[in-house]
């Protein structure tokens, strides 16, 4: 009986574990999810301050650097109207892949004095049948 109760409690507790939500884009080859969106600098190759606001769909790069080999620094697969917000001086260094690759509508938006430098051995920005808008950069 005791084992039976333990099994029931274990099964019920696993039912309450929520699955992580994916937001439809990747940073440095890693899905941005409900588990990691507040601090994307935990991803290997990402430094500075990088975070995502799911309510406004804004990915903020704040004096950030993304350095990767073999994957895109930012890959927007299905996040419609993603805004890449630039604060301060930002750098993307990518080898063997496109720096920013968009499959959905994306806006790269800066404020006064913000910059984004893309260094790449292939192409800096690749957009596949989707609008890309660059504002105040």
Kindly label every feature range from the protein language model:
Residues 20-137:
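A composition-driven surface/loop motif
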Residues 1-20:
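Bacterial Sec-dependent N-terminal signal peptides
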